[in-house]
Amino acid sequence: MSIEVLGISGSPIENSNTDRLIRAMLEATERESEFVKLSRITVRPCFACKRCIPDNVCKVRDDFPELAEKIKEARALIIGAYTPYKQIDGFTKALLERFWSLRHVNNLLRGKLCATVLTYLTPDAADHVNQSLATELEQMERMELVGQLMVKGNLTCLTCGVGDECEMSGIKRRYGPEARSCDVPYSRVEDQQEVWEKAMRIGRLIGQRLRTMDRN
């Protein structure tokens, strides 16, 4: 069966909050879906070679052309990212750059449904990244953005093994001079009730919209 909803995660952490929420949203759509983790494949940044202009096919030799076929086939995308250094992660940034190859003349993403998941530590930075995502997907790719989710993530220093001793650790800076990694609870997306419920609503909405399109 063809892919109707494609979930793409830019989180490199195995079974991360981002991954689990995307998978749950895919299930909530009740449509044929597939999950892709960008850290398991190779999608390099755009080389600005412009060789994609005549046929909307990227000529960079990595895994994007194969992924692009799935993206073109899908009727809806759920894109997950996170915000290291208060910016969008490199995996997702490279993917968004490569969307450029699909835009020329034919605008192959136009009209597709889309939702985003963003895992963050700093709310202000996340707001800025969310705004940038909305601008690219709606205004540049002409997709229909049906929802955006923000998930509270976890400080990397909590699980690196040296976070309590490292001079550069963010634990004390963020949680106080006496804080230790064992004092900070792990943030699970399943425990963020409002976020989880909103995600399920968005997933169901995508499924409903696709069913409505089928009837028309």
Residue ranges and their predicted role:
Residues 9, 37, 149-150:
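Residue-level recognition of beta-strand->loop/alpha-helix junctions
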Residues 144-216:
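Glycine-rich phosphate/pyrophosphate-binding loop and the adjoining helix
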Residues 2-31:
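N-terminal beta1-alpha1 ligand-phosphate binding loop
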Residues 9-11, 18-21, 76-91, 185-205:
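Short Fe-S-cluster ligation motifs
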Residues 53-69, 165-174:
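Iron-sulfur (Fe-S) cluster-binding segments and ferredoxin-like electron-carrier domains
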